Amino acid sequence: MAGSTPAPHGDGPLVGVLALQGDVREHVRVLEGFGARTRLVRQPKDLPGISGLVIPGGESTVMDKLSRQFGIAEPLRAAIDDGLPVYGTCAGLIMLADEIVDAIHDQRGIGGLDVSVRRNAFGSQTASFEVDLDVPALGAPPVHAVFIRAPVVASVGPAASALASLDDGRVVAVRQGALLGTSFHPEVTGDLRFHRLFLDMVEDAGRTL
């Protein structure tokens, strides 16, 4: 994964994928499958021209540290404040949360989503699981969701809305305006309705940095 030149796929919007760490390629493949163009984003110079951004799953503490080392954290927060559509999956949701209730060391994330999250809420990777989720915003059938060392949304503030919850009531998908977050990994299941929803959000926003 080298360079930040848009991939020659489709003529849709140019969507960045934060490429500091995590399952970057999977998101690129899904986005390009929908006809979007993609750009790997690591530094502030990679932001101008994109119409949306995906923050992939991975290790949130590593991603947080690298985002500051590469100088992308503050410009990205400014872009979010300016209305850039962003979709965060798993660690990406943690990065978007305004509060990380069990943050370690100086972990801060980027923020923007009016939620608090709890890291690794379901235990270690051996405790990963799959479940079908009812997501009214996406209609039938249920979304088959894969949770891998996943966070959970501990609380949803007044600016955000829950899109999906587990049977025990724990929230695992949220939206706030142009921001979208899921605890799980739609990019690995073949059910790509959350990516389609995000691209619709990008189109509705109709903006570029």
Curated annotation (Swiss-Prot):
PROSITE patterns with a match to the protein in the record: PDXT_SNO_1, PDXT_SNO_2
Single Gene Ontology MF annotation: glutaminase activity
Binding site for L-glutamine: G58, E59, S60, R119, I148, R149
The keyword Calcium is assigned to this record: no
SUPFAM superfamilies assigned to the protein according to its UniProt record, in alphabetical order: Class I glutamine amidotransferase-like
EC number(s) stated in the UniProt entry for this protein: 4.3.3.6, 3.5.1.2
Keyword annotations: Glutamine amidotransferase, Hydrolase, Lyase, Pyridoxal phosphate
Reactions the enzyme catalyzes: aldehydo-D-ribose 5-phosphate + D-glyceraldehyde 3-phosphate + L-glutamine = pyridoxal 5'-phosphate + L-glutamate + phosphate + 3 H2O + H(+); L-glutamine + H2O = L-glutamate + NH4(+)
GO biological process assignments: glutamine catabolic process; pyridoxal phosphate biosynthetic process; pyridoxine metabolic process
Active-site residue numbers: C90 (nucleophile), H185 (charge relay system), E187 (charge relay system)
Disulfide bridges in this chain: none
GO cellular component: cytosol; glutaminase complex
Domain of life where this protein originates: Bacteria
Similarity comment text for this entry: Belongs to the glutaminase PdxT/SNO family.
Subunit architecture: In the presence of PdxS, forms a dodecamer of heterodimers. Only shows activity in the heterodimer.
PANTHER family the UniProt entry points to: PYRIDOXAL 5'-PHOSPHATE SYNTHASE SUBUNIT SNO, PYRIDOXAL 5'-PHOSPHATE SYNTHASE SUBUNIT SNO1-RELATED
Full protein name: Pyridoxal 5'-phosphate synthase subunit PdxT
Organism: Clavibacter sepedonicus (Clavibacter michiganensis subsp. sepedonicus)
Chain's gene name: pdxT
